[in-house]
A protein has these predicted regions:
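Aromatic- and Gly/Pro-rich donor/ligand-binding loops
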Residues: 5-17, 21-178
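Alpha-helix N-cap/helix-start capping motif
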Residues: 24, 190-191
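Alpha-helix capping/helix-boundary segments
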Residues: 133, 192-193
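Short, structured coil segments at secondary-structure junctions
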Residues: 152, 182, 200-204
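A short beta-strand/loop micro-motif in the catalytic core of glycosyltransferases
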Residues: 183-190
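Helix-loop-beta element that forms the nucleotide-linked donor phosphate-binding surface
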Residues: 194-211
């Protein structure tokens, strides 16, 4: 019997050990559960290959202080690229080697928000997680991480996803409620996430261990 396919979207390719390990572990556990899983190669907004668009901006009014912080991080990132040390280059190379040997990615790489929504990959089910994929402090449109690009007839679930905060800003609550309702099943990493989902939607989320 052919295995059911699962497409996973998560935070990856940001040269961070935690992000790399959680993405590998999520894919690995899906495979161990009997599914044919692969990672949707959508570049996170912090990846230098990601192309920003108007539609990829945060889906709620972003606080000025957070915008200033994001701009500061952007400047620091550009400076680091100019004066990139051999150790940083080596680290990036090792991450790329890890991807080749241990991760399985979608055939197409999505560098833009519009690419993902206009031509989404096809799977039997879609998963988001783990990591802080729902953190409202992220300066990007979180719709991809709520699987809004997925056809409504498909199974959409989160696995050990994290908000990274204990509450959602009032200005973003409407969007979060709508996005959470888009998911067929909800699994979160922290107990506070269970409470937050209940508070926002009245739904019962499953508290599950980060893979």
């Amino acid at each position: 019997m052919k295995k059911k396919t699962v497409g996973i979207i998560t935070i990856l390719k940001v040269n961070n050990y935690g992000a790399e390990l959680q993405s590998y572990a999520t894919q690995r556990i899906m495979n161990l559960m009997g599914y044919d899983a692969e990672i949707i190669d959508y570049l996170y907004y912090r990846n230098s290959g990601h192309i920003k668009e108007k539609c990829s901006m945060p889906f709620y009014p972003y606080p000025v202080k957070n915008r200033i912080k994001e701009f500061g991080l952007y400047v620091i990132d550009k400076i680091e690229k100019i004066f990139e040390s051999d150790s940083i280059k080596h680290r990036k190379m090792r991450f790329e080697e890890f991807h080749k040997h241990f991760n399985r990615f979608s055939t197409k790489q999505y560098r833009k928000y519009s690419e993902l929504f206009n031509n989404p990959p096809i799977y039997d089910a879609y998963c988001v997680g783990s990591d802080q994929v729902w953190n409202p402090r992220c300066y990007t449109n979180l719709n991809p991480y709520f699987l809004k690009f997925v056809p409504n007839i498909s199974i959409k679930f989160s696995y050990a996803s994290s908000f990274g905060v204990k509450d959602i800003p009032d200005s973003a609550r409407k969007q979060y409620i709508e996005c959470l309702q888009n998911l067929s099943y909800i699994g979160v990493r922290e107990e506070t996430g269970v409470d937050l989902v209940q508070k926002l939607t009245g739904r019962k989320a499953t508290w599950c261990l980060d893979p």
